[in-house]
């Protein structure tokens, strides 16, 4: 294929589960100088919900103070909370880095990802297929999708036919749900426009901004010229405004995967090794693209339906693939896998280091910079080595690498030497 493929991959949702080392009500952030919007009511699981704002825009949403905690016979740990990046924050240059710093600086103990949405915006598929025609072929039964049997469709029923603009595969309880829809159409709906998404499109050369004019009729019957903007094919925008009716807006489509917490374990289809989905896996565009392709390999897999000589439908494993996205030959296929949730004791060295790091974080005798370092090490420890909750066989396959353990212990030794230099004991 000689044509250039323009596409834009992004986070669209990121939510994590944490535990507070100290209570963090909305007044804590207000006293630090943040603008905070507190909701008058909580959620079915949490008493308190508030949003931290920056320059009037939502930054991070916090849900805390659970109704049912384990100390009172409930299901949540004491201090449990959920943190979520706002949709606008997901489109920052480094949203995961910002999220990490927020978790560390404000004393949250990271436990794991509860939901992450990864999306790709594009004009056409990698071999030039029109997304609208792909939806039409799917609804007409010319192609079929592997996995995720539940499907929901949205479109319009017109005299000359039905036109589909959105499909969703998977159920509310699925580990992964898949969506394909016309993102331009969604943003054009009143009250749904998101300028930061359109800015990303321009940076990725999916479209260009065209200033337009249109006639507006006032309440007194007089008319005036007003200005607006449309998004046209990249490089075709004119410097001067043009009438709105002469502007042909380019449709940009989106494929989106929503991954829930029970899909946090991934298996390498070649080596059969298990890997944990963490913030480290989604902190760059290239990592997001790799994860998107892994998901697409399993959850956006289509077959072209063919028939036998007798006129019966051919078995799906004998039908040819309908390839939509091109992936590198160097990329390895990973598949989400739900693992048993039975508790398994962590290795003893992890428990010892974790307990001492917690004491460092909560001790009043420890300087702030050392407590922050301890919290950072603790986050990294749980990011790389949180293995309990898997079966014995799986834990043997997904064994600790010596490098990870050595690096973490070396950081811990440096921290202990800093304490000894200050003659602090804990």
Say what each PLM segment does.
Residues 1-340, 349-426:
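Structured, helix-rich domain cores that form ligand/interaction pockets
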